[in-house]
Every structure is written in C-alpha cells, then in structure tokens.
Amino acid sequence: MKYSTLAWLVIASYTVFAQDGTSVTGYTTTIVIPGSPPAGAGTAHGDTENTGTVHTTEHLTGTEETHTTGATPETTTIVAPTTTHENTTTHETSVENTATVHHNTTTLHHNTTTIHPNATGTETHTETGTGTLTGTGTEGPALTTTTVAEAFSLAAGASLGYLVALLFL
C-alpha cells in the first residue's frame, strides 16, 4: 500500500514539473497612472533605461577592454490617460396643445334574480343478489416445528462457518 502511494506521488510531481518548464530572462512592466504624470519622474514615452555599469580600461598595449555588469535591463512603459472635454447643449422647445373630447356612455343592465326552491327528499337504495362461488386449488402446508428446527440449524451452521473463516484471516 505504501509503495503504490509513493508511485502516485512521483507520477503527479513529474506531471507538475513537465507543465512548469519555462524560463524568464527579461520582463516588461506597464504602469498606468491616473491623471497626468509628474514632470521628470522615470522614463517617459516608452524610453528604455539600462541600469548596468560599463567599465572601460585601456591597457599599455593599446587594446581596449570593455566590461559590462548589471542585470537584464527592464523596459518600463508609463501610459497616461487622455481626457477630452466636450460640452454640447441643444435646446429645442415645442409646445402643442391638443384637446380630445371623450363622450361618456353608460349602459344600465337590469338585475334579474331567479329563486330556486330547496328540494328535500329521501332516497333508499337496496341491492340484492344471489350467486355461487366456485373454485378449486390446494392449500399450502402450515408452519410446523420441523420447519422451524431446520431454519435454526441453517442459521447456526452459517454462524459457525463465519467464525472458522475469521480464524484463517
């Protein structure tokens, strides 16, 4: 059981490492600042600033040697939002008076009431009939003490078999 768990962990870790095999050498950052940018802060308009240091040494032999140190340069882009203000006002006034006359019509319906008298009465229903019930068949055996004894013996045998099986496990 422990071996199979270890095998699954190894397979899962190889799967994760296979998906994560990317390398990064440089990166670009875009910063969006609301409003106008302050004067003289950082680089503007996507210019690139190299933070490395360059040393130039000239030997007595006349050859020139150049050493460059520093990290991979970072490119920073600052995007300032542009705001446009436009005010447009249009006033149009139009007044038209329209009169509509509606005629009221009233319809009167006559009320009609119908009175039904309550009816009371008694009803008697009698059903009589004659017939014959016929059929053939056999009646099953009744539960006897022999059947109960066989069931008890079967249960005891199953219990004994269960106990013997537990001894060998």
Curated annotation (Swiss-Prot):
Expression induction: Up-regulated upon milbemycins A3 oxim derivative (A3Ox) treatment.
Location (main, coarse): membrane
Protein name (database record): Probable GPI-anchored adhesin-like protein PGA22
Propeptide feature: residues: 141-169
Organism: Candida albicans (strain SC5314 / ATCC MYA-2876) (Yeast)
Function: Putative adhesin which may be involved in cell adhesion and virulence.
UniProt topology in membrane: Lipid-anchor; GPI-anchor
Top-rank taxon: Eukaryota
Keyword tags: Cell adhesion, Cell membrane, Glycoprotein, GPI-anchor, Lipoprotein, Membrane, Signal, Virulence
Gene behind the chain: PGA22
Localisation per UniProt entry: Cell membrane
